[in-house]
Amino acid sequence: MNFAVISTEIFILCLGLFAIVMDLVLPAKESHKSIGAVLIFALTGWFLYMFTLYQGPLNPMEPEAMAVIADKFFYQGMYFVDNYALFFKQMFILATVFTMLFASDYVQSVLRYKGEFYALLLMALLGMCVLASATDFLTMFIGLELMTISFYILTGARMSSKDSSEAAVKYLIIGSVSTATMLYGISLVYGLSLIHI
C-alpha cells in the first residue's frame, strides 16, 4: 500500500492529536493562542505543499501512465487521489483555516475546552478529505460520519447555553434520520446493481 496517497489525512490526524496533547500540557491562558497559531501555520503550509502534488495530463495509451494512475489508489481501490480530490482537499483546508481565524475570539471568550474545539474541527476536516477521495459507498459513509459527528459535538460545545444544547439535539435527530435514509438507499443500490460497496 502506498501511504503517500493518504499523507494529507495522516497529517490532519496528527494535528488533531497535537491539539489535544498541547491543550493538556500548556497553561489554560496560553493554550488557545499557541495551539491556534501553530495549527493555522501548519495547515497553511500543507495547503501550499499540496500544489506540488498535482499531476499533469496523462495519455492512457502510454505504459507509464497506467503505473502513475495505479499509484494513486490506496487499499484495493477504496481510496483514490487525483487532481480533483486534491483541489477539494485544498478548499476544505482553506475553509478550516478561515474558520479558525474567525472563531478565535469566540473560542477565547466562550468555550471552556479550547483544544477540543480545534481537535474536533480537524476531525471534521479529516472526514471531508476522506469524502473527497472516496471511491465506494463504505469509504464515503465513514468520511461523512466522521465529519457529521464532529459537527454534532461542536454544535453543543457551549455547555452553558440551552440554545446550543437544543441545536445539537435537533441536529443529531435530523442527521440520524438522513443517515438512515442514505443507508437504505445504499442498500437498494447495492442489491439492484450487485456492485461492490
Identify the meaning behind each predicted range.
Residues 1-195:
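Alpha-helical transmembrane segments of multi-pass membrane proteins predominantly involved
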